[in-house]
Amino acid sequence: DRFSSSENGYTHTLTTIPRQANITDSPTAFKDTDNPWFKYSNPGNFNMECWLEPNPNGEHYAKRTLSGTSGTFTWELTNDERKQLREACKGKTCTIRIGLYSNNCSWASYHDRTYQMTNAEPTINSVVTSIINPFGSLCLQNRSNIKFTISATAKYGATITNYAVSGNNFSYAGSKNTCQTSNIRDSGSLKYTVTVTDSRGFTASTIKTINVTGYSYPTISMEAFRSNSSGTKDVSSGT
């Protein structure tokens, strides 16, 4: 402390008291495969604890302790911690808080950043097709229908929310993993696009080819006419 005096009184100047630790820099965005970092200033040399918080005001993950009056801290995230962060992120991206406590969690400093999911597309395990009204093992034009049964798996805690099949004047989209066409009107190698969408909005697609044999139902052609006694057509004098 310093004192000074004059005829008008005296001045008392207090020394600067170090306060909380602060985050001074951090990446504006990072991927789920990255190790995030931040720079900090800790003029009071307090004890510190940092954390990652998807969806701010939620649970704290990847807690670490650190020390020093300034520096850069980088997480070395474990596979379990990455799994926790991914499952907490409900979209293709989400807000994640980089937080820093100091002085036994008395003060907090934080930056809210963008967390980006990568390689999170669902997997189509199989697309099974069944021929309804076949001829033997053949899928026949104008006779047979095709039933699609789709098996797919979402990643990192997401769920499959939509199944879709389209092609050759057929279209289906819905929450059920099965659908069926009406009678197939075309023949040849018909291609159908199968798409699944998960709860984060990620999609995966595949092409399914169905071989359809050309077929038309038989027709009967009839003609009526006059004939003579020998059965020969005679439109003028036949009976």
Predicted regions and their residues:
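Conserved structural position at the C-terminal beta-strand
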Residues: R2, I98-S102, V196-D198
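Edge beta-strands of extracellular beta-sandwich domains
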Residues: F3-T15, C105-T118, F202-V212
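Short, solvent-exposed loop/linker segments at the N-terminal edge
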Residues: D25-T33, I131-N145, R226-G238
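Acidic, Ser/Thr
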Residues: F38-N45, S144-G157, T239
